[in-house]
């Protein structure tokens, strides 16, 4: 009987440990991702020259496949590509992005309203978009 209860307890504990998410469920490991650091809230423009200078192989993908992720969700983007679905000189991306603030730091506190200043992060004002 004790063996049965111990087995049942261990089974339940192991089930709870697998129910936690890693936070990287949005990643599709068959795709390439490039990191952009954002430190100001507003509309941002990334043009052909910026991507090319960063070493991103622009000839290998179509603009219809470009996605942008930040703050644990997909961000809408406006792509100006001349209608040819390729990223050429003069083409650019526009998107709205927010700087890092206290949105995720609130998870550190038992009471989320206990954060000192919700407009500023405890750790860094820069956030990465992919």
PLM features: residue spans?
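Structured catalytic cores of large enzymes
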Residues: 20-40, 54-130
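Short amphipathic, basic-aromatic surface patches that mediate peripheral association
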Residues: 45-57
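Bacterial Sec-dependent N-terminal signal peptides
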Residues: 1-23
């Amino acid at each position: 009987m004790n063996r049965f209860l111990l087995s049942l307890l261990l089974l339940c504990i192991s089930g709870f440990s697998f129910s936690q998410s890693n936070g990287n469920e949005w990643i599709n490991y068959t795709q390439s991702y490039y990191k952009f650091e954002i430190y100001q809230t507003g509309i941002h423009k990334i043009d052909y020259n910026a991507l090319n200078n960063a070493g991103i192989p622009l000839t290998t993908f179509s603009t219809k496949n470009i996605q942008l992720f930040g703050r644990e969700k997909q961000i809408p983007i406006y792509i100006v590509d001349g209608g040819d679905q390729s990223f050429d000189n003069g083409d650019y991306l526009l998107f709205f992005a927010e700087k890092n603030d206290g949105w995720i730091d609130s998870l550190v506190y038992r009471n989320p309203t206990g954060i000192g200043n919700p407009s500023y992060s405890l750790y860094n004002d820069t956030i990465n978009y992919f």
